Swiss-Prot record:
A Pfam family: HypA
Protein task: Involved in the maturation of [NiFe] hydrogenases. Required for nickel insertion into the metal center of the hydrogenase.
An individual GO BP term: protein maturation
Cysteine-cysteine disulfides: none
Family: Belongs to the HypA/HybF family.
PROSITE patterns in the record: HYPA (PS01249)
The protein's name: Hydrogenase maturation factor HypA
Keyword vocabulary terms for this entry: Metal-binding, Nickel, Zinc
Taxonomic lineage: Bacteria, Bacillati, Cyanobacteriota, Cyanophyceae, Nostocales
Record: residues binding Zn(2+): 70, 73, 86, 88
Domain of life: Bacteria
Protein's organism: Trichormus variabilis (strain ATCC 29413 / PCC 7937) (Anabaena variabilis)
Amino acid sequence: MHELGITQNIVAIVNEYAHGAKVRRVLLEIGKLSAIMPDAIKFCFDICSQGTVLEGAVLEILEIPGLAKCRQCGAEIALEKPFGICNCGSVHLDLITGEELKIKEIEVEEVCV
């Protein structure tokens, strides 16, 4: 389960960017073709965030669909797998979206001085 290592890195990155402020929410973008299981990330997030400024934070995951462009005709096609066939018959596709793993937003509590 590589999601544990990925989640540990996500927690470390968010922790660094929070500069000690309590994190309320984290928004991730995960591509549907990335071979990363969002449910496993959510499970690991609850464990990995314990004892950090992320403890209790809400993890939101936005799944990005697979999209490719045909090299032959230029058409864009939706992909459910990391490969496919265009309506023109070509298998020469360039992936546009679907393999993302991004920390898109971090919401922290405002620090009152």
